[in-house]
Swiss-Prot record:
This is Diaminopimelate decarboxylase. Pfam families: Orn_Arg_deC_N (PF02784), Orn_DAP_Arg_deC (PF00278). PANTHER family: DIAMINOPIMELATE DECARBOXYLASE, GROUP IV DECARBOXYLASE. Pyridoxal 5'-phosphate binds at G248, E290, P291, G292, R293, Y390. Its EC number is 4.1.1.20. The keyword Aminoacyl-tRNA synthetase does not apply. The modification N6-(pyridoxal phosphate)lysine is found at K66. Homodimer. It catalyses: meso-2,6-diaminopimelate + H(+) = L-lysine + CO2. GO terms for biological process: lysine biosynthetic process via diaminopimelate. Its cofactor is pyridoxal 5'-phosphate.
Amino acid sequence: MFLHGTSRQNQHGHLEIGGVDALYLAEKYGTPLYVYDVALIRERAKSFKQAFISAGLKAQVAYASKAFSSVAMIQLAEEEGLSLDVVSGGELYTAVAAGFPAERIHFHGNNKSREELRMALEHRIGCIVVDNFYEIALLEDLCKETGHSIDVLLRITPGVEAHTHDYITTGQEDSKFGFDLHNGQTERAIEQVLQSEHIQLLGVHCHIGSQIFDTAGFVLAAEKIFKKLDEWRDSYSFVSKVLNLGGGFGIRYTEDDEPLHATEYVEKIIEAVKENASRYGFDIPEIWIEPGRSLVGDAGTTLYTVGSQKEVPGVRQYVAVDGGMNDNIRPALYQAKYEAAAANRIGEAHDKTVSIAGKCCESGDMLIWDIDLPEVKEGDLLAVFCTGAYGYSMANNYNRIPRPAVVFVENGEAHLVVKRETYEDIVKLDLPFKTGVKQ
């Protein structure tokens, strides 16, 4: 069993996170419960930033808020001096509600609506990452209408395949995102933006995938982009002030995962950018990166209460908990794997193989297959580790189950940052079906 960040076994034999006993958290806030180790988030943020500071380079480390967005999380990102990557009007609204500096917000997405782009312009955000020709035309029209101007990056697909799950590989040519780097699309986009009266082309962006454990993809992407930048300088007199190489830095979910440290990713990116800038005679552009999962993923733990059990003789022992695919859909969606422990008996031998089932009325609602735990019983507390990314943000009300609360823990204190949904919350937007209305 691998404990991340400040997680440890305390004197009572319980799991402790951020100096707070997991049993206390479950008793006070209920389960399922998302618990975030704030100290670990801070540590990761500082590691990414310090690597650029040590190199003496201009850079922005933008938190990819789709991993986990709440007012408190955005405020924590601001406190750590991060920029912010948003991908919807809702994420932008959350950032505004949190008081995040608009000039450090970058707006991504492949189908931004007119209303979302208008919102971005009205709040004077720092940059829009343009994804397609439709968006260029729409943005130009809105800028004329509102009298605003905007800096943009062009999202390109460099044709670099990250060694990761197909569903989250986004840098290949066959992708819903961005302009293809090799078929002339990017050149057409550059021409269109350079002709604009209101849109300023700041640079280019790419994202090659997620849960990446080496740096080869980032190096190759940088090489391909700089080769094109050299051509674009000659063709359009365009010099990229910003190079955004995205995120996708991996974390350790299980013992099979071997991610690099944050500084190792950044140092290799810096090396690749410096080398290619020198090769083609460019000044080093400002480098942007977008860590999301790598900032919050292993800082999150979900606490569940054990309920029923079912034994299939000679096959498997099922242990059911009070959550499931409604609070963590990743196992069903991506076949994601997690480690877990009995939080109230974490020091005991984990020597009985069981499978953890969710409570949803869905045969595929399985959180973990074949994991070793102590002999668990009803009422035991199960901790599933590394649920900080894409757990709460992908949570849903399937089976009309309320979404869990979220707690931040740090220095022995717990702070509720998202309230648990109630049944009243689930029906508050519903309207009755009225019969007998005359037409």
